[in-house]
C-alpha cells in the first residue's frame, strides 16, 4: 500500500451527531434562532434531520457542553449565550489545530490591545478604575511569584477589556489572552526584570485610563506587548514556531 493510500484509508467520516450539532449552530449564528428562543423538541429534530433519537441527543449534549443551548425549566431546549471563556477555548483549540504561530498571535494581540486601551481610556467607569487600582496594588505585593503575577496580568487585561465597553473586542481578545497567560508565566520565571517591567507598564496604563489619555494608553500598550515579545525570545523561544498543545493544555487549565 502506498503512503498516499495509507493516508486515505485513515480518514474517518464526521459522526452524524456532530453534523447535527454543526447544523443547529450554523442556524443560531446566522440569526435564524435568537437567544431564548426554542430550537424544537427532540422528536422534531429527529424528523427534521432524518436521524435517530440517540444521534440528536448526542448533538444536543455537545451544544449544551459548549453553552450554545440550554434546557429551560420546562425541559425545552433553547438558545443560550455562551460565556466568553467557552467561546474562547473553542477558538483557542482552532488556533492550535491551524498551527498559528506566536508571531501571528503577537500581531493580532497588538491590534486588539491598542483598540481596547483606546476604548478603556474613553469609557472606563469609576468602578472598573478602582478594580484596576486594586489589581495593581496586589501585583506589587507578589512580584516574587511568577504564577501570581501572570494571573493578575490576565485579570488586569480582562478588566481593561470590560472598561472598553466593547463586547466585540472582549470576545475577540479572549482566545489570544488564554494563550498569552502561560507564556507570560514562563517569561516571568526566566527573565528577572520581567515582573517589575510588567508592573511599571500596568501603572502607566492605569494612569492613562485615569487621565482619559488615549495616546499615552496606546504608547504603553505597545511597549507592554513589545516587552512580552522580547521576553519570549530571551526565554529561548522562536516567534515563528506554532502554538503547540502544551500551551493549549496550560491555558485551558488556567481558565477552568
Indicate residue ranges for each PLM-predicted region:
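Solenoid-repeat scaffolds in large eukaryotic assemblies
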Residues: 129, 149, 217-218
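Alpha-helix C-terminal capping/termination sites
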Residues: 122, 142-145, 210-211
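Short linear motifs at protein or domain termini
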Residues: 1-118, 122, 239, 250-256
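Hydrophobic side-chain positions on well-ordered alpha-helices
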Residues: 27, 142, 161, 208-209
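Hydrophobic, amphipathic alpha-helical faces that serve as interaction scaffolds
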Residues: 78, 87-88, 96, 108-127, ...
